[in-house]
Amino acid sequence: MAQAIIGAIAASTAGSALGAGIQVGGEAALQSQRYQQNLQLQENSFKHDREMIGYQVEASNQLLAKNLATRYSLLRAGGLTSADAARSVAGAPVTRIVDWNGVRVSAPESSATTLRSGGFMSVPIPFASKQKQVQSSGISNPNYSPSSISRTTSWVESQNSSRFGNLSPYHAEALNTVWLTPPGSTASSTLSSVPRGYFNTDRLPLFANNRR
């Protein structure tokens, strides 16, 4: 009887120990599985973030390259050379020249533009002065005399002829480049591209340093 009781107790204890061991082993396996799942999840999340950052950097580079290419194309269409267009896109100073209109950006490949949209600026054409006709009788009004009407008609005809006949947008000597002599220069040329008869260059400050 006592042996049976001791055997039952021993069997119960052994079963409890075996069950506890199985439970501990199961929990350890479950923890290991959770750890591997978390590790894989972190790796996938890091990989996803790295790919997204790479896509963002690539998209930003493509957008920047497109914007720079657009600016370069616009500058080239405006007449700038390839070197000046690239320098302007990069933020560097471009080539500038001095002419009779002042300092301007060099755009040798641009088409001539004017202040009038859709047409050219008319160049005044001097017309021969006409002698005033002397009226033999009556009260003469200079504002309504035949000579005034004739001058008005001649002026309108000259404007029409200059607008449709002369297609030059500038004066013949307006775009000639002038190279000024710096104050400390000893080897610069003093030749001007425009005849001295057009401008009194002796009284202009820009020509104060020209050697004679």
Curated annotation (Swiss-Prot):
The keyword Disulfide bond does not apply. Keywords: Capsid decoration protein, Capsid protein, Host cytoplasm, Virion. It is found in: Virion; Host cytoplasm. It holds the Pfam family RNA_capsid. InterPro entries: VP2. It comes from the Viruses. One of its GO terms (cellular component) is host cell cytoplasm. Belongs to the norovirus VP2 family. Translated by a ribosomal termination-reinitiation process from the bicistronic mRNA coding for VP1 and VP2. The N-terminus domain points away from the virion surface. Minor structural protein that forms a portal-like structure at a unique three-fold axis of symmetry, following binding to the host receptor. The channel formed by VP2 may allow the delivery of the viral genome through the host endosomal membrane. Homooligomer. The portal-like structure consists in 12 copies of VP2. Interacts with capsid protein VP1. This is Minor capsid protein VP2. It comes from Norovirus (strain Human/NoV/United States/Norwalk/1968/GI).
